[in-house]
Amino acid sequence: MGRAAILLGAALGLAAVGARAAVPDDVRMKGPFLIASTPYLADGAVDFDALVAEARYLDAAGCTGVIWPQSNDSIDLLTPAEKREGLRRLVVAAASFTNAVLTMGVSGTNTAETLAFAAFAEELAAQSPAPVALAARPPTDARTAAEVEACFEALGRVAKRPVIIQTFVSDDCPAPSVAFLVDLARRFPGVYGYIKEESEGARANARQAEEIVAKPVVKTVFSAWGGWQWLYQRRALGTEGLVSERPAYAPLVAHIWRTMQAGDPDGRLQEAYAMYRYLIDQRAIPGGSLRGYSLHYLKKLGLFRTTLSRTYLSSRVTESGTFGVGHDWKLVDLELTDAQRAELDANFEGMRRFLAREAAR
């Protein structure tokens, strides 16, 4: 038994340290699985207390899953030790979750790193009384379909619980084919069949349609890319959740999902979704909506102590956008004018009023 398991067992007060964690069933593996943003202290160190507070906020808001680490900056710019410590803290916190499945990101630069993180995550999960899942994307350094496929096949032999596959990393790394994803789900039925379709635009819709046709071998297809097409993909294609780094809007995202599940009986789903789209589309405000100005909200909520980010020293522009390169970073603060803060605050208060009205109906 590893040291991580012993320490976690002590933290959770488990009498039987070797007990196997509950594995979430397919019903739990649907809905908004939001990616937690990584918070930082003034010196650039990871603020693990804030990370736990953020995860608890997502759970209390009604999200069905909390994923960490999963976004590019958290995968590339955190040290292995920082990722392990964050996961330890989150597994302890997840014991008191009432809604969310803790989903541990195990993505690595290569297959060996991915498998090492997965083994560590399984060691932690084996001590958790709460259901735990995993999430992975193709290894950053993979350049051929064969390399991507080999990684997921190897991971399928290590994982003992559901793994959400994110299909896209960068233009340099090929996305796994739909045929391969379906075959994986058939060969590893307790592990695969949960897909975050990360392709963009019309290609995402085409792939999702293929994946959903493969049900019940494929269990859940999640919308992605911030939820830009979530409403269409739910109504026209049948996606059953969202995976995205939009933690500040968790109460609204959870409300949208509940309304989707209920079949939109009052015809108000489109209004709720329009509110969400407006919140994430403040393009004139610095930083973008993925992390950027959302940090202002996370700090205002009392979850984060700073609005600092580790930012790539190098980046590259591709057809799919601008992507960070390497593992070197600088510490950058979010800088907003008073007018920008006022606009963001007005938008957030609008969301709160909307949710209060919906709750009173």
Show where each model-derived region lies:
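General structural feature for long, well-ordered alpha-helical segments within catalytic domains
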Residues: 47-50, 54, 82, 86, ...
